Amino acid sequence: CIRDSYRTERLVESLRKHCPNGIDIDFENVGGAALDAVLSLINLGARMVLCGLISQYNATRPVPGPYNFANVLIQRARIEGFIVLDYLHRAPEAISALSEWFKEGKIRYRVEVVDGLENAVDTINRLFDGSHQGKLIVKVSQEPW
């Protein structure tokens, strides 16, 4: 529900607009300010799946924890880590369901293709600075392998 809003200063405001009744479930990939905003709006018994924390992957010093982590206790929320490799055996099932949802228009995605191996470093760095939307692909060759 926050999509592009995690790059702005108005995270809580944006979340409140899109989730006026609070947040029951969060699939967290960003961390940092986005996680702080979510924690400020979690409902009683909220469930949070922690899949990534991209906001701190390139940190050069220890990253402080969420400033309002006490809300997890107050709201009796649950947080569980999720590593996709733990579910690799279910990949065919996931591919089948996701393909069907895509065909039905229930899910969409964005892809940006950047040409040239010489652009790989800058393109990969965009994963961490928030200057992209969707998937980034570096096209290194016109020829098939």
Feature locations, PLM:
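Terminal helix/beta-alpha structural elements that buttress the NAD(P)+-binding lobe
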Residues: R3-W145
